[in-house]
From Swiss-Prot:
Pathway: Polyol metabolism; 1,2-propanediol degradation; Cofactor biosynthesis; adenosylcobalamin biosynthesis. It comes from Citrobacter freundii. This is Corrinoid adenosyltransferase PduO. The keyword Phosphoprotein does not apply. Its cofactor is heme b; Mg(2+). Converts cob(I)alamin to adenosylcobalamin (adenosylcob(III)alamin), the cofactor for propanediol dehydratase. Found in the bacterial microcompartment (BMC) dedicated to 1,2-propanediol (1,2-PD) degradation. PduS and PduO allow regeneration of the adenosylcobalamin cofactor within the BMC. Expression of a cosmid containing the full 21-gene pdu operon in E.coli allows E.coli to grow on 1,2-propanediol (1,2-PD) with the appearance of bacterial microcompartments (BMC) in its cytoplasm. It catalyses: cob(I)alamin-[corrinoid adenosyltransferase] + ATP = apo-[corrinoid adenosyltransferase] + adenosylcob(III)alamin + triphosphate. InterPro entries: CblAdoTrfase-like, CblAdoTrfase-like_sf, PduO, PduO-typ, PduO/GlcC-like, PduO/GlcC-like_sf. Forms a complex with PduS. Keywords: ATP-binding, Bacterial microcompartment, Cobalamin biosynthesis, Heme, Iron, Magnesium, Metal-binding, Nucleotide-binding, Transferase. PANTHER family: CORRINOID ADENOSYLTRANSFERASE (PTHR12213), CORRINOID ADENOSYLTRANSFERASE MMAB (PTHR12213:SF0).
Amino acid sequence: MAIYTRTGDAGTTALFTGQRVSKTHPRVEAYGTLDELNAALSLCVCAAKNPQHRQLLENIQLQLFWFSAELASESEQPAPEQRYISSEEIAALEAAIDTAMGRVPPLRSFILPGRSEAASRLHFARTLARRAERRLVELSTEISVRHVLMRYINRLSDCLYALARAEDHDAHQNNIIQKVAERYLAAIRTSATREPAMSLSFQELHQLTRAAVMRAEELQVPVVISIVDANGTQTVTWRMPDALLVSSELAPKKAWTAVAMKTATHELTSAVQPGAALYGLESHMQGKVVTFGGGYALWREGLLLGGLGISGGSVEQDMDIAETAIAAINVRTHQ
């Protein structure tokens, strides 16, 4: 079946009522821009990772068909049997906005539009929604346009912005998880190929623990001392009398974090701040990772031997005790 009629070859098009108008008519510009937006939303649906976002975007695409049909008709009100935009659709957009914005950190400056493909496409669609809104405002100076349509298109651009932020946030968090997993797997592979002798001996474990206890006694700070091997498995845990109960949880986590991330825990502090590369790491690791001082990776000849975690005093005291203990044996805190 032919899709061409040749009736538009002269630069005119027909409205639903049969009236022919110029293809540059504000009414045609308005629903034509909605058509552009709908096509862009198809790309958004394909790129979005969140299934709820995809379903919402498909619903919006259907609603834009109703919207365009209303603009292509000269009737001031939609026919009773016609599907049309109502306050219900606006409420759904507002609910989606609130949900998406409730999941992302606040912004204090302008951002580049989109760090992921889905967010980039959503931001592009947002600009088309804004253009459609401008065309609708222009059209409203010539004909009567239902106010609910103005509200809907205004809210739609906000919704696309919120979805873009949420898609970016999810992509960033997934990237963090992937990086942590890669580092952890790399640590496992390294441990599987290292020389059997390249681990802390019983004498070194004893010396490390003893040096930590002696320094803690000098500072009059009861602490918990935890040492893990290169696989993150605990080899030594020593709790001094009167050490805080919470320290029995924190010290092993500090030691494990130092091995998993191959770095001292205090060096992670800046990396997990909002906007930094590892922001959200702690929540995604369900509290297993510690990002304040007291945990150190233990290296020798470029190989990771294990990790030391101290908890019980202030961050500075924990770091002091750990560094004093490390100085007592032949290891480094950096590769």
